[in-house]
């Protein structure tokens, strides 16, 4: 039976779901994260207290160029403003390479990065060598960043990974459940992914080297169009993120192929900043970041992403809704 949902009912659904996942996520803070590992991410409930001394410090918060990153950038920016800092924003910068370069040359004070991306893209760690423990992956990433005059704050509860996705109709037609099921079929299929995917070991290179797959064609595409090319039949396969809002929508339209050879390691988000800024900004800098991200479970992050990608709200508004619902701001 097909049920039509009005735009209003969809908004109401996401509002209810967001409130629920925030309550559950924050209640669980300090006990365990999404990977079942104990975490001391700190924070939880409690309103952010503004410190007048923080107003002497200006922080420029950056982000990469897709929904989840921009929402995180807004959450961090608004939280730091609430803590009394003077905050500028340079969100939607580009790929991880662009964001890290902006941090190193002083354009931004910090940005959210994934531990798996940091280890594989910046520090030459092979995907299968990325620690499965979020805390271990964080400690290794932090140690490598510190060699470059940077540092990183503790990880989010949620983790995200690249994934090969397709329409459910395509998966059913071709008998696809695992990525290895593409063996013998990939040369007839077109794969779309972000421009940097071509050079990443946890993306196209991993599919080629880890699975031995060759595709009919790889087409670089803007991250915001990864589902559009599937819907329009331009792509047979597309590189998706496991926290994408579209995968949480109640429609069973898209499927992710299981990464049975583990070339797509999951990564928790860490906030990367330079050591001099961290010292100048004082303890409220790290405290505020870890406090407001402590409620970001996988379900909470998917719902926040959905408010932007599905419900077409502005990232700044979504971030404010999250901070208010969690009690971080009044």
Where in this protein do the model-derived segments appear?
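C-terminal motif of bacterial Sec signal peptides marking the signal peptidase cleavage site
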Residues: 24-28
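Bacterial signal peptide processing site
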Residues: 30-33
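Extracytoplasmic "Venus flytrap"
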Residues: 40-74, 91-95, 196-199
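Short helices/loops that flank or line small-molecule/ion binding pockets
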Residues: 74-82, 97-108, 124, 205-210, ...
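Short helix-initiation/N-cap motifs at beta->coil->alpha
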Residues: 89-101, 195, 216-228
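A conserved helix-loop-strand patch within extracytoplasmic ligand-binding domains
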Residues: 131-190, 275, 294-298
């Amino acid at each position: 039976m097909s049920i039509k949902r009005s735009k209003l009912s969809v908004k109401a659904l996401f509002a209810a779901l967001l409130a629920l996942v925030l309550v559950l996520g924050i209640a669980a803070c300090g006990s365990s994260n999404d990977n079942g590992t104990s975490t001391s991410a700190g924070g939880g409930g409690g309103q952010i207290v503004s410190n007048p001394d923080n107003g002497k410090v200006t922080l420029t918060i950056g982000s990469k160029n897709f929904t989840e990153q921009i929402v995180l950038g807004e959450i961090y920016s608004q939280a730091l403003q609430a803590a009394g800092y003077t905050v500028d924003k340079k969100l939607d910068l580009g790929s991880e390479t662009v964001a890290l370069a902006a941090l190193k040359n002083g354009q931004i004070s910090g940005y959210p990065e994934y531990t798996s991306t940091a280890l594989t893209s910046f520090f030459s760690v092979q995907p299968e060598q990325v620690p499965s423990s979020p805390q271990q992956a964080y400690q290794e990433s932090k140690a490598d960043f510190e060699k470059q005059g940077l540092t990183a704050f503790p990880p989010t509860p949620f983790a995200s990974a690249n994934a090969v996705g397709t329409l459910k109709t395509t998966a059913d037609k071709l008998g696809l459940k695992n990525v290895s099921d593409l063996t013998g079929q990939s040369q007839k299929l077109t794969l779309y992914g972000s421009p940097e995917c071509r050079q990443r070991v946890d993306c196209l290179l991993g599919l080629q080297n880890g699975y031995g797959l060759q595709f009919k064609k790889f087409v670089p595409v803007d991250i915001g169009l990864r589902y559009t090319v599937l819907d329009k039949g331009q792509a047979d396969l597309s590189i998706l993120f496991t926290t994408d809002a579209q995968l949480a929508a109640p429609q069973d339209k898209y499927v992710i192929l299981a990464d049975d050879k583990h070339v797509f390691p999951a990564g928790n988000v860490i906030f990367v900043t330079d050591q001099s800024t961290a010292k100048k900004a004082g303890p409220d800098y790290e405290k505020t970041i870890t406090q407001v991200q402590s409620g970001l479970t996988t379900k909470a992050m998917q719902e926040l992403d959905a408010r932007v990608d599905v419900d077409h709200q502005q990232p700044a508004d979504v971030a404010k809704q999250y901070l208010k619902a969690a009690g971080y701001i009044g």
